[in-house]
């Protein structure tokens, strides 16, 4: 909820301005850890070019975004052994996009009994693994 309720106006775009926790870059796309993860291993895949609309992506961008999405699922299956995934795109603030100006795909690993996903009422949750630890665990698999 923090990312929806309190947008940091000093950061124009996390994908363009704040490229920390980037696991891999290709010519047209990148995959990075979400700074406000729903679950450990929550990744985001985005085009490098600042573009808001799905229909404005080039064929090359679409191809590389899907290849990185596929790679991300394979890596997460290997190291985190999730029971499933939520994979999706939030287009527009009303749809939950925290950064609506730069389209991106969320890849969220899920486990059976996972009741800690996107809590709305309490607006808090415990993430069992810190982002630094998750980054260090995932980074070698993307090299």
Predicted regions: what they are:
Residues 58-82, 132-134, 139:
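Long, well-ordered alpha-helical scaffolding segments within enzyme catalytic domains
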Residues 86, 96-116:
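Histidine-centered divalent-metal-coordination microenvironment in nucleic-acid enzymes
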Residues 1-41, 45-46:
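Active-site microenvironments that recognize anionic phosphate/pyrophosphate groups
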Residues 44-66, 121-127:
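Short histidine-centered catalytic/ligand-binding loop motif
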Residues 42, 50, 102-106:
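Histidine-centered active-site/metal-ligand motif
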Residues 2-8, 109-143:
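C-terminal helix-cap and adjacent tail motif
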Residues 28, 37-38, 51, 70, ...:
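Short, charged/polar surface micro-motifs in flexible loops or helix N-caps
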Residues 80-93:
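A short glycine-rich, hydrophobically flanked beta-strand micro-motif that places a catalytic Asp/Glu
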């Amino acid at each position: 909820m923090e990312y929806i309720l309190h947008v940091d106006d000093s950061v124009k775009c996390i994908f363009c301005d704040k490229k920390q926790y980037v696991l891999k870059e290709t010519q047209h796309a990148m995959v990075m850890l979400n700074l406000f993860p729903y679950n450990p291993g929550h990744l985001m895949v985005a085009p490098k070019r600042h573009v808001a609309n799905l229909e404005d992506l080039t064929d090359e961008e679409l191809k590389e975004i899907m290849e990185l999405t596929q790679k991300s699922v394979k890596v997460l299956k290997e190291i985190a052994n999730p029971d499933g995934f939520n994979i999706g795109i939030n287009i527009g603030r009303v749809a939950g996009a925290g950064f609506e100006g730069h389209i991106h795909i969320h890849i969220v690993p899920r486990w059976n009994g996972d009741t800690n996903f996107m809590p709305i009422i309490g607006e808090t949750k415990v993430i069992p693994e810190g982002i630094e630890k998750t980054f260090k665990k995932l980074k070698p698999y993307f090299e």
